Amino acid sequence: LTCVTKDTIFGITTQNCPAGQNLCFIRRHYINHRYTEITRGCTATCPKPTNVRETIHCCNTDKCNE
């Protein structure tokens, strides 16, 4: 499985997931109406949001977290 780790104006950076990590995730943490912190990568289980300003989406196909 190949997941996106960074998505910038210069293009995307990907990572081949290690054995046992068969999901990609994208985590959006809303700081304010102008700024959102985004984290992407591989995971074994889909993480749960830690607060109401955070959303997490998991998927299992190549680059699905772009």
Curated annotation (Swiss-Prot):
<keyword id="KW-0800">Toxin</keyword>
<dbReference type="InterPro" id="IPR018354">
    <property type="entry name" value="Snake_toxin_con_site"/>
</dbReference>
<feature type="disulfide bond">
    <location>
        <begin position="59"/>
        <end position="64"/>
    </location>
</feature>
<keyword id="KW-1213">G-protein coupled receptor impairing toxin</keyword>
<comment type="function">
    <text>Non-competitive antagonist of alpha-2 adrenergic receptors (ADRA2) in smooth muscles, and partial antagonist of D3 dopamine receptors (DRD3) (inhibits 25% of methylspiperone binding to this receptor). Also shows a low antagonism on D2 dopamine receptors (DRD2) (short isoform). Shows high affinity to adrenergic receptors (Ki=14 nM (ADRA2A), Ki=73 nM (ADRA2B), and Ki=38 nM (ADRA2C)). Increases heart rate and blood catecholamine concentrations.</text>
</comment>
<keyword id="KW-1015">Disulfide bond</keyword>
<dbReference type="InterPro" id="IPR054131">
    <property type="entry name" value="Toxin_cobra-type"/>
</dbReference>
<protein>
    <recommendedName>
        <fullName>Rho-elapitoxin-Da1b</fullName>
    </recommendedName>
</protein>
<dbReference type="GO" id="GO:0090729">
    <property type="term" value="F:toxin activity"/>
</dbReference>
<dbReference type="Pfam" id="PF21947">
    <property type="entry name" value="Toxin_cobra-type"/>
</dbReference>
<dbReference type="InterPro" id="IPR045860">
    <property type="entry name" value="Snake_toxin-like_sf"/>
</dbReference>
<feature type="disulfide bond">
    <location>
        <begin position="46"/>
        <end position="58"/>
    </location>
</feature>
<feature type="disulfide bond">
    <location>
        <begin position="3"/>
        <end position="24"/>
    </location>
</feature>
<feature type="disulfide bond">
    <location>
        <begin position="17"/>
        <end position="42"/>
    </location>
</feature>
<dbReference type="InterPro" id="IPR003571">
    <property type="entry name" value="Snake_3FTx"/>
</dbReference>
<dbReference type="GO" id="GO:0005576">
    <property type="term" value="C:extracellular region"/>
</dbReference>
<comment type="similarity">
    <text>Belongs to the three-finger toxin family. Short-chain subfamily. Aminergic toxin sub-subfamily.</text>
</comment>
<keyword id="KW-0964">Secreted</keyword>
